[in-house]
């Protein structure tokens, strides 16, 4: 792993790790959305679980769309940035605008489509930033480690933030802002031309 911190790779390694961590941190916070719907919106637990399930079903198409767009229309870096920004806008609408169950379903579905869908190209983008002999190490550090830390800390952070600031501000701080910051971090990474991948 120390080779990733040599001068040639350090900046790229840290940017990828930080971007991935922030993204996973925000994603991890959304694991508590059922609790948000039952506490902040006072929904029945069955309705809260249903809307999460339906939205994840919609989100599955986001993975496919991101893969197609990242492979054939845009480069992967730009797909991640676009999907993250669209996902953050939908997240804002989910928390601050949507009121009815149907409105929530639409914007939550859009959030999962874009925000979660970016993961279809993120791992590949991390790997293609490094030569073949470093890809497994880079993917484990800047990818898997960052994801596990984010998934672990995100739910803890939203429970703390919701208790201290309320659910809407909590999700703004712990969910929405980290997605936008991750998108900005990915902007600092150079696009990888397809011919340089292999």
What are these regions (language model features)?
Residues 76-122:
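C-terminal transmembrane helical hairpin of 12-TM major facilitator-type secondary transporters
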